């Protein structure tokens, strides 16, 4: 890994401690990235421990293949396939811990050719796995005003969503303009159409770029499926540690843990026998502690950790 694309794992010790690693346990790192969390988990495992790591980014897979360790298995695919992978390796009900480090990694942001950053000019792509799906540039050509507005508002929580969407549509309808294929073009376009007051707080393209990335990679659907999959494959007392980086992700994780810790909700006064109530099932998880945020020292060392939140839950 080059120094330029170095990745600093966020909340590393806290997330690993949250898994309560057993030396002979079986663990899944749903987001290998550049291997910071995976390597730390391996360092805590004994010779009978096992780690399965997942990533859909081919560059992450290439990095993972450098690990020569019989206890380690890398799986190329989305973490939404976690339950399927667990069945493939006969792990259902035997996994002692799952770690999910959500969002985009520093190497993905720093590599202009991946098209994630509005700070560096590159192809307007944003796919976690460039071998599947379509790039943002193609989607913007095919989308209409309402589509673009909805994505920016829903996944970027940007109050200027329609204004930005109108700017994008107007740009593309002007035949004198070059096709919108570069991150630099899109960042400038958004900056040009954003209100002046909006520009003073942070780069006006921040939320729109986040929105397009989340949408093009189906990130929220992936997270929802991965959380359900993780809960279904954990052994009793198995742990799940989830690091999120923006409010949409954290709300999903928080609500999932809350829902799974409450069990089925039976309307008050509904005439059910004790056997019928038992048949509905019970709580599946319990939250461990409160949400954890990075220390001031970590934020000073890695400003990208500033918005991160760690939540931990245990299988009942």
Curated annotation (Swiss-Prot):
GO terms of molecular function: rRNA (cytosine-N4-)-methyltransferase activity
Keywords: Cytoplasm, Methyltransferase, rRNA processing, S-adenosyl-L-methionine, Transferase
KW Methyltransferase (keyword) present: yes
EC number assigned by the record: 2.1.1.199
Gene Ontology biological-process annotations: rRNA base methylation
Residue spans of biased composition, Basic and acidic residues class: 294-304
Annotated S-adenosyl-L-methionine binding sites: 35-37, 55, 79, 101, 108
SUPFAM superfamilies per record: Putative methyltransferase TM0872, insert domain (SSF81799), S-adenosyl-L-methionine-dependent methyltransferases (SSF53335)
One Pfam family cited in the UniProt record for this chain: Methyltransf_5
Cell inner membrane is among the record's keywords: no
Catalytic activity of the protein: cytidine(1402) in 16S rRNA + S-adenosyl-L-methionine = N(4)-methylcytidine(1402) in 16S rRNA + S-adenosyl-L-homocysteine + H(+)
Catalytic class of the enzyme: transferase
Region Disordered, annotated ranges: 291-316
Subcellular location as annotated: Cytoplasm
Matching InterPro entries: RsmH (IPR002903), SAM-dep_MeTrfase_MraW_recog (IPR023397), SAM-dependent_MTases_sf (IPR029063)
GO cellular component: cytoplasm
Family: Belongs to the methyltransferase superfamily. RsmH family.
Annotated function: Specifically methylates the N4 position of cytidine in position 1402 (C1402) of 16S rRNA.
NCBIfam families per the UniProt record, alphabetical: 16S rRNA (cytosine(1402)-N(4))-methyltransferase RsmH
Name by which UniProt lists this protein: Ribosomal RNA small subunit methyltransferase H
């Amino acid at each position: 890994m080059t120094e330029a694309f170095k990745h600093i794992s966020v909340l590393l010790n806290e997330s690993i401690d949250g898994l309560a690693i057993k030396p002979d346990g079986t663990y899944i790192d749903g987001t290998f990235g550049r291997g910071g969390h995976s390597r730390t988990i391996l360092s805590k495992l004994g010779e009978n421990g096992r780690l399965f790591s997942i990533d859909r980014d081919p560059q992450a897979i290439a990095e993972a293949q450098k690990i020569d360790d019989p206890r380690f298995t890398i799986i190329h695919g989305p973490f939404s396939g976690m339950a399927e992978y667990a069945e493939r390796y006969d792990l259902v009900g035997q996994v002692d811990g799952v770690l999910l480090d959500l969002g985009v990694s520093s190497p993905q942001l720093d590599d202009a050719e991946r098209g994630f950053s509005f700070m560096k000019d590159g192809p307007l792509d944003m796919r976690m796995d460039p071998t599947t799906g379509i790039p943002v540039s193609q989607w913007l050509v095919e989308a209409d005003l309402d589509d673009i507005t909805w994505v920016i508002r829903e996944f970027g929580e940007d109050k200027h969503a329609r204004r930005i969407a109108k700017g994008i549509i107007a740009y593309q309808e002007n035949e004198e303009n070059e096709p919108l294929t570069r991150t630099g073009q899109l960042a400038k376009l958004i900056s040009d159409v954003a209100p002046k007051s909006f520009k003073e707080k942070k780069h006006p393209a921040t939320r729109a770029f986040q929105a397009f990335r989340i949408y093009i990679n189906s990130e929220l659907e992936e997270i929802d499926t991965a959380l359900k999959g993780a809960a279904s494959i954990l052994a009793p007392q198995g742990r799940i540690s989830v690091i999120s980086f923006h409010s949409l992700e954290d709300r999903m994780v928080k609500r999932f843990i809350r829902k799974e810790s409450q069990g089925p909700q039976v309307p008050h006064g509904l005439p059910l026998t004790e056997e019928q109530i038992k048949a509905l099932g019970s709580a599946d998880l319990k939250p461990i502690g409160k949400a954890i945020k990075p220390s001031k020292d970590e934020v000073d060392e890695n400003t990208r950790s500033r918005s991160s939140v760690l939540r931990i839950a245990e299988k009942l």
